[in-house]
């Protein structure tokens, strides 16, 4: 983060960003996705799922279009889906209704003091959430327990190799949503149109994030037809 901007804060200057300003003005629900890998694909999949369910969706952040200019057209019932980088999240105040952290690897360290600084920058995506909000974490990622320890919101997980009590899981080649330990089948993993095990993980994250917004049949239909 720019040292000159940081130095301005103690002198009473208001330091903000386009995205932070958008959060303060946005009238509708917000899904925010961050992580080292898969965030663009996961953000796009979440957007496609919500659109297929009938929501009016605005895609932005690192992808899509600048959203401040379309704020006047946004309605309360719309949904915004954002891809956010660690650089955007550093020192940023935000409270998305649903936050997703896909995974964490030592990326973009040129923009951070060290790996711990990078890890902690991602916490900004959910630290101001409340009990009714949702944080979605990768159960297979070593940093998820650390993130969960700071969460005040509900925490759901996704995994392609271990059982989850709430979230989404792939077991024996079948993808399920899970609520309170009860599984609801969505589809076989080999039915996902975008190839690769990493894209199954991206869909698991998206299915966990959109539970309560998008039904299982719509999830299956999108995953079988969306080409990326």
Task: Identify the residue ranges that each predicted region occupies.
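Phosphate-binding loop of NTP-binding sites
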Residues: 1-139, 143-154
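Adenine nucleotide phosphate-binding catalytic loops in nucleotide-utilizing enzymes
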Residues: 112-116, 153-228
């Amino acid at each position: 983060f720019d040292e000159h901007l940081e130095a301005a804060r103690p002198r009473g200057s208001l330091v903000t960003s386009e995205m932070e300003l958008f959060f303060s003005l946005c009238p509708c629900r917000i899904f925010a996705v961050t992580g080292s890998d898969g965030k663009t694909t996961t953000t796009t999949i979440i957007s496609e799922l919500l659109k297929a369910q009938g929501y009016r969706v605005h895609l932005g952040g690192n992808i899509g279009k600048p959203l401040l200019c379309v704020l006047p057209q946004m309605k309360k019932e719309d949904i915004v889906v954002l891809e956010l980088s660690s650089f955007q999240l550093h020192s940023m105040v935000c409270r998305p209704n649903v936050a997703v952290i896909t995974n964490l690897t030592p990326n973009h360290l040129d923009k951070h003091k060290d790996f711990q600084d990078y890890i902690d920058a991602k916490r900004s995506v959910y630290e101001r959430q409340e009990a009714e909000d949702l944080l979605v974490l990768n159960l297979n990622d070593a940093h998820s327990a650390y993130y969960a320890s700071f969460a005040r919101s509900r925490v759901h997980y996704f995994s392609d190799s271990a059982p989850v009590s709430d979230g989404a899981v792939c077991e024996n080649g079948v993808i399920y949503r899970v609520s309170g330990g009860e599984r609801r089948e969505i589809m076989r993993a080999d039915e996902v149109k975008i190839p690769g095990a990493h894209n199954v993980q991206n869909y698991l994250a998206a299915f966990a994030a959109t539970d309560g917004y998008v039904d299982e049949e719509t999830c299956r239909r999108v995953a079988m037809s969306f080409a990326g």
